[in-house]
Amino acid sequence: MSRVCQVTGKGPVTGNNISHANNKTRRRFLPNLQHHRFWVESEKRFVRLRVSAKGMRIIDKRGIDAVLVDIRKAGAKV
């Protein structure tokens, strides 16, 4: 399973670690992903999503039903 948020689409990005001596080494910045179960009242079941912390805030704001419509429209099986 890839490290991508199912709500926002955020994934890893690359950058540099920079030491005190200004030496640069490559690194990855990973999104803050969590596996979370959401209760979907209209379907009377739990849905398990891999979402970032920002994705959880979007679900709180818009509602799980509206977010699931967008996820399913993008072609993901949920």
Swiss-Prot record:
Keywords for the protein's UniProt record, in alphabetical order: Ribonucleoprotein, Ribosomal protein
Recorded family membership: Belongs to the bacterial ribosomal protein bL28 family.
HAMAP family the record matches: Ribosomal_bL28
GO MF entry, a single one: structural constituent of ribosome
Protein's GO biological process: translation
GO cellular component, one term: cytosolic large ribosomal subunit
NCBIfam families for the chain: L28 (TIGR00009)
Gene3D superfamilies listed in its UniProt record: Ribosomal protein L28/L24
Region (Disordered): 1-20
NAD among keywords: no
This protein's name: Large ribosomal subunit protein bL28
Organism: Pseudomonas putida (strain ATCC 47054 / DSM 6125 / CFBP 8728 / NCIMB 11950 / KT2440)
